[in-house]
Amino acid sequence: MARGVAGVLRRAYSSRVTVLFSTRNLHSFRESESRSLCNSDFDVPTNRFCSGNRVRIQFPWNDYRFGCFEIGKVRSFSSTVDNNGENDDIEESVGSESDDYDEEGLINELSDVDEGLLNDSVVAETDEIGSEAARALNDRYHDPVELYRELRGSEVRSKLQHSEWDSLHEIFGFFAQSGWAANQALAIYIGKSFFPTAVSKFRDFFIEKCGIEVVQDLVRVGPTDVAVKFLFPVFVEFCIEEFPDEIKRFKSIVDTADLTKPATWFPFARAMKRKIVYHCGPTNSGKTYNALQRFMEAKNGLYCSPLRLLAMEVFDKVNALGIYCSLLTGQEKKYVPFANHVSCTVEMVSTDELYEVAVLDEIQMMADPSRGHAWTKALLGLKADEIHLCGDPSVLDIVRKMCADTGDELVEEHYERFKPLVVEAKTLLGELKNVKSGDCVVAFSRREIFEVKMAIEKHTNHRCCVIYGALPPETRRQQAKLFNDQENEYDVLVASDAVGMGLNLNIRRVVFYSLNKYNGDKIVPVAASQVKQIAGRAGRRGSRYPDGLTTTLHLEDLNYLIECLQQPFDEVTKVGLFPFFEQIELFAAQVPDMAFSNLLEHFGKHCRLDGSYFLCRHDHVKKVANMLEKVEGLSLEDRFNFCFAPVNIRNPRAMHNLYRFASSYSQNMPVNVAMGIPKSSAKSDAQLLDLESRHQILSMYLWLSNQFEENFPFVEKVEAMATNIAELLGESLSKASWKMESKEEKVKGQMKEDRGYERPASLIKLVKKRKDEKLV
């Protein structure tokens, strides 16, 4: 084996030389080998070349044409090259799948081929010779501008030998595939999509104009990084002269997709000397309480919440204490007369108003892949004398960096839990009958939540409240109130990860039903940060359960729970950004005929970001944009706003209603909700899902009514419908005792087609009456 091709390659590498396996020599190999061993289509580009002490030989191993090359074991030795006496036998197995090589320069091997065929196939050059060639090349042509002018002025084409022609094509092929060259070309506004075309034109120009000396010097260096770095300055001169229109076009695109230095987007905030107070600590450490105290003391203030539910809770609490406070969320606007304080969701933050104190809750959400941009915008753009940040330590370092960039003063206040969270070593041993009063059992799927609820109520005397993300905020608040009330029989909570933030709950112990969840693609372990957030909900100062406990249902999950709680918070290195509409509008002007869905994708490819930021995911936006492409008459701004509507993109019914809303709006018609409503609570899982879906559609209508007020006039009717459905959902959860249905059964059990709202007037009167009673 060692005397065959693999042996020669191995000896060449062991002597620390570079190896070039050229396409031309593969042609020779084909011609000298029988057709039974080598297919006639063998002459295809198959090689790469790397200088230095590494070898890279690439073959398309999965291609039937290369079946003659087998994989084997080789024994390293050297009989022709001085290897400094290191001729010890080393047996090594060589793979064939990877296009890469490791730090030791592992070689893909060939076997069962006569060694004599390699005489003119393997060109071995020592590093010293390669270095001399590189030095000679750079010394002789040190000025790329001068070389380019010589090439441009040349009229006589040099006669190249066939081997030189092939070698030049190899070199330019390597240049075209160089990631370094493609990235550097962006600096002169040659985009990656146009880069191959530019290289092709440059290759033709160079081969036609270059002199024989330049060719020979380049061939000596070969398709290496040295050749790429030598050719690149000449390539730049060629592109600047040859493609001015393309460069100008791409520069305009890049300039409008520039998301670098986002702090400069808010000049009024930069003109202020802001004080940033970071309340850093775990759940149930009092950090948000202290920030809210400062919020209520201020002459005017803003509280920014990650959830509607939490914004509503602060709104109620502050008003109950006699401080007038308004509520702003995507779905509702409640302006309280004489109010100087506002509780809002973070997406509703206004960077135009001036505040004495602003509170940004759950600041670690800046790193959220979808919504992080809202926190980043608020932190950079709020015009407030004091901004209080509440969150865990994961984003502390990047907040320090952002404050250094903006010139804001940063004050850090660190907190610990009032009482440590205790892990119970004794789990529930897989038996839900072991739950106790005050327990919160956390499951990560809707099906599991209801299975747990029904099992507990069947085998124990406990009654369960239920909280999960698809429920309306009003229903979740009702379930939380039911659980916190000691005067009823509902003493166990079954919840999803939605329990991690947004509700004040009197939880004695958090029990994890499982520590795995479906991420939309596969089952994965729950992230440590999420485990800590949820487990930290146990125990609450001032409640009947001040001490927090946590454990798992199954013993096999306990070690992972302990590991997650002991693990420090991961340090965040980047936070989210997303362009404003004005930036999208400028970008669209550069590509006027592009569909909006493609526009967003194009923007994502060309936008420039600082190292501290990432572009937030916009899969949801793109899917809605694709659906709305068929709707004519929408302006760019209309499409932008419709795409951010809170729609469940996995729910065809919700998507259909969004399409219908957009179609009516595009025709300048009043947008109505053509939806009936059940008169009683759900009797099955299918009916419960139907109620959830209906409420989501109504919520979407209310959100759109705040974007397009004139065209969504039936707000009062929709609010009444939404309130009614939220109450029906609460009743349904209290009575839920049905068997969970499969997806097939759910399809069969779909509700009848909507035939319009059945009783709007009476329902509106009822809702008004209830509001009046509450005011009294």
From Swiss-Prot:
SUPFAM superfamilies assigned to the protein according to its UniProt record, in alphabetical order: P-loop containing nucleoside triphosphate hydrolases
Annotated compartments: Nucleus; Mitochondrion matrix; Mitochondrion matrix, Mitochondrion nucleoid
Keywords for the protein's UniProt record, in alphabetical order: ATP-binding, Helicase, Hydrolase, Mitochondrion, Mitochondrion nucleoid, Nucleotide-binding, Nucleus, RNA-binding, Transit peptide
GO molecular function terms listed in the Swiss-Prot or TrEMBL record: ATP binding; ATP hydrolysis activity; RNA binding; RNA helicase activity
GO cellular component, one term: nucleus
Disordered: region residues: 80-101
Motif DEIH box, chain ranges: 361-364
Record-linked Gene3D superfamilies: 1.20.272.40, 1.20.58.1080, P-loop containing nucleotide triphosphate hydrolases
Enzyme Commission code: 3.6.4.13
Top-rank taxon: Eukaryota
Main location as per UniProt: nucleus
Cofactor(s) of this protein: Mg(2+); Mn(2+)
Residues that hold ATP according to the record: 281-288
Name of the protein in question: DExH-box ATP-dependent RNA helicase DExH18, mitochondrial
Highest classification ranks of the organism: Eukaryota, Viridiplantae, Streptophyta, Embryophyta, Tracheophyta
